Amino acid sequence: MKLLTHYKGKEYYYTDNMLYVKTGDGAQFQKLALFDRHFYKLRVFNKIPILEIDGLRMQLVRDFKTPLDYPKEVVRTLGIKKGESVLDTCTGLGYIAIEAEKCGAKITTCELSPAVLTLAKWNPWSDHLFSSPNIESLQSDIAHLIKGMKDKIFDVIIHDPPRFSHAPDLYSQSFYRELFRVLKGRGRLFHYVGSVGESRGRSLASESSRRLASTGFKDIKENKRLQGVFARK
C-alpha cells in the first residue's frame, strides 16, 4: 500500500486495484468502494483516482498520460470561453466540469447515481466540483431533468454518458432532440460514444452521427482519439 496524498486532514493510500482513506491517527483504512445495485469503487491510474463500476473503467485513459488529460483535451477542442454556460450531462468524478470551469464558464452538471457522488465527495481531485460557486452539481436523471429546462440556454453541451448497453436512452434520437433544444444557436456539442462494438464492425460514432444529423446538428466530426463526436447547432 502506497501513500497517494494528504488532503484536509485525511491520508489517501492505494494498491493496484483500490483507493483507501485514513481519517485520523489510529483510524482504520477505509476502502473507497460501495455497493448500490452495482459495485462502485475508486482506484488509481498514474497517481489520479478513477471510477470503476462493476469493473468497468469510467474514464478514458488509453493514449493519455493521466485521467485529467482527456477532459483537458475535450474542453480545449470545444474552445470553451469565459462567461459561457455549459451543460455536463453525466458528472462522474467531475473532472470535465472542473476543467470547463477553469475557463471561466458556468457549469450545470448532473449525476444519476448517489453512489458516484458519494465517492466523488471523498476524492480530493473532485473537491472543486462541490466548492466552486460556478458549478451547479445536481443529483438527477438527465433524461428527465432536461425536459424541464428552457430552450436555448447552453453555449456548450458535454455529453459523456455510460456505455450504450448501460444507458441506451442517452443515445436515442429523442434525447438528442432535447440536447438540440436546450443548446443555443451555433452552440457546440461533444458526445463521447466509446469504442464498444468496433471489433464486431459496429460504429457507435457513425450511428450517433447519423441521429445527430437527422436531429439538426451540423459540422459533425468524429474524433477517434477522444472516442466521440463533435457537432454544432
Q: What are these model-predicted stretches?
A:
Residues 1-44:
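N-terminal auxiliary segments of SAM/dcSAM-dependent transferases
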Residues 65-83:
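Conserved alpha-helix/loop element of class I SAM-dependent methyltransferases that forms part
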Residues 81-92, 108:
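Conserved class I S-adenosyl-L-methionine
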Residues 93-105:
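Conserved SAM-binding loop of SAM-dependent methyltransferases across substrates and taxa
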Residues 110-150:
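S-adenosyl-L-methionine
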Residues 171-185:
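A short glycine-rich, Lys/Arg-flanked "PGG" loop and its adjoining helix->strand segment in the class I
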Residues 186-194:
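Conserved beta-strand signature within the Rossmann-like core of class I S-adenosyl-L-methionine
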